[in-house]
UniProtKB/Swiss-Prot annotation:
Subunit organization: Homodimer.
Domain writeup: The 3'-5' exonuclease domain lacks the conserved Asp-Glu-Asp-Asp (DEDD) residues that coordinates divalent ions essential for exonuclease activity.
InterPro entries in the cross-refs: piRNA_biogenesis_EXD1, RNaseH-like_sf, RNaseH_sf
Domain 3'-5' exonuclease: 32-82
One Gene Ontology molecular-function label: protein homodimerization activity
Keywords: RNA-binding
Disrupted-gene phenotype: No visible phenotype. Flies display normal fertility and do not show any transposon activation in the germline.
Organism per entry: Drosophila melanogaster (Fruit fly)
Name this protein carries in UniProt: Protein Exd1 homolog
Amino acid sequence: MNKSDGNESFALDSLPENIRYPFGKRELEILEKQLDRIVLIYQVDTTYHSALKDIKDQKIISLLVEPSFYGRHHPTSILVVATCNGTYIFDIKALGLIFLELAKILEADQPRKVIHYSHRIADHLLHRQRISLGGIFDTFVAVCLSSNTRIPYTLPEAISLVFGLPMEKVTGGCESQRNFTARPLTHSQMRYLAKLVQLQHIMHDHLNYSHIFCAEVYRISLEFSHSYYGLRSCDVAINMAPASSFGFQLLDSFCKKADKELEQI
């Protein structure tokens, strides 16, 4: 998420040591190499089908949708997918919609999808693309359970906290990067999206403590992603304010159990 979504910055309090993984020089160099492998897809051609093949071959992918902060209330502009081989930016505005083959991948249990704020993204995909997102690992849920907090950190804020990176380095500090509905997309916008989705992927790797914890996050993420299901659009709008904690109550019932599991790891 980003400031174009209207989200105000929350105090970036220190996270517990067990979920802080400061980025070093080597990690930043690897990230820079990953940012050289960005593929923009705006039509159904060989590049599109090659991207789908790579995505289907993965066990885990990282996913962004822009704009999605207000769920169903904005049309889909961009879908970004990161694999171990690179980043694919699907220009949904140019394509017209998310076509069936890609939709089936998003709905399937495999590959697993690493996303942030699954309740907002799932609501968006359901109402804008008629896609019921499956196989979800929500990094927001993972951070909440790991740190025993309920602060609505955006993806850039969570990345900044977990990896010890200044917010300016995560966001780039350029307002034009946050307008993903205008065309053409700039080179800096594409690098910004690729950086977020790749760092989200890496964050999953670090927050994936054990099979037990991972399974719990998957289970809670799926339930959390359904937070807005069945609500009228007017009710959803009220509960999608930037500081909204709607749906967070689902995390509370699992908190004590998750804490006990973490103590045993």
